Amino acid sequence: MNNHSYLKKNSFHEGDARELLKCIEEESIALSVWSPPYHVGKKYEEGQTYEQWSSLLTKVIALHYPILKPGGFLVINIDDILAFPDPRMPRFQAVNLKKHRVSVTREDILNALKLEPELTKYQLAKKFNCSEQTIERRLKGNNIRGGKYNVQTKVKLAGPVLEKAAEEAGLYLYDRRIWAKDPAWQNSQWHSNSYKAVSEFEHLYIFWKPGETVIDRNKLSKEEWASWASRGIWYIPSVRKNDDHEAKFPLLLPQRLIKLLTQKGDTVLDCFMGSGTTAVAALSESRNFIGIEKEPKYIQLSNKNVETFYISRNKEASKIKETNHSVTDEKKKAEQLELLLEENENSL
């Protein structure tokens, strides 16, 4: 591929990561950090099977080897336990007693049918003072998490898929961090229909491409090394508002990874860019970025967020400039006053 065909830095590129990653200059990426589809009920994940998901991740990871610098890193942020639709999975029968508006049980109905086998569900409903739907649910066991018509979900671990795909690509697990976030779905009906824990943390799988890695302990302060850079658990609050994108991670997350694993002037990649958070983090730390995103509306959102960053930074620079001018003016006034006092003293 000639130089003019490479994806432009500090730009967002619309398309499928499996195609556009082939258009990045070889050994030009110091860090790739991204979060793939999570399979936690988001609209854009609907209908994707476990096999399709693992195939997507395997292909994307494989395409990273040529473009990463030797000694560079790939970081994948992901919830390690994911749920996928699987028609072979037995249905989970969740009888939620709290939601029963009437006290009639399956045993009550069966006992009534023993005495009067000819009773219809409508007659049973009248007998127990409930709806015929309640009779049907009790008899047929339709108290099922996910609904009686939806395909049941199967829980899978993400980590083994990522590690296997990375090793096949020539990348090796270097480290793993835990992002401790706010508990998710605390007020959700899903939570009330399960004994499962709400999601309170995610993993950061850090993979390394063999080669020379620069270790510079001076690029972070002693406080940064002590509080997070050398720690396995990062306590970072979740994004408070996901009104413009369903799965945003906080700015501080890619910011820390960029500060820790790259140098100023390096290029950072996010091939599932979403709302542009990684791009803003890269720019804020004096790095370049390349963003890939298949949804046009999120390309627009990313551009908007980068524009907002530049406006904010320019305002900050103007304030600093004004402050410096003010300090300079005050210094000049002080020097002039000191000179006048000295002249006055000499004249006495």
UniProtKB/Swiss-Prot annotation:
Signal peptide: none annotated. The keyword RNA-binding does not apply. The keyword Nucleotide-binding does not apply. Its EC number is 2.1.1.113. GO terms for biological process: DNA restriction-modification system; methylation. It catalyses: a 2'-deoxycytidine in DNA + S-adenosyl-L-methionine = an N(4)-methyl-2'-deoxycytidine in DNA + S-adenosyl-L-homocysteine + H(+). It is an enzyme of class 2 (transferase). One of its GO terms (molecular function) is N-methyltransferase activity. Keywords: DNA-binding, Methyltransferase, Restriction system, S-adenosyl-L-methionine, Transferase. InterPro entries: DNA_methylase_N4/N6, RM_Methyltransferase, SAM-dependent_MTases_sf, WH-like_DNA-bd_sf. It holds the Pfam family N6_N4_Mtase. It comes from the Bacteria. Belongs to the N(4)/N(6)-methyltransferase family. This is Type II methyltransferase M.BglI. The gene is bglIM.
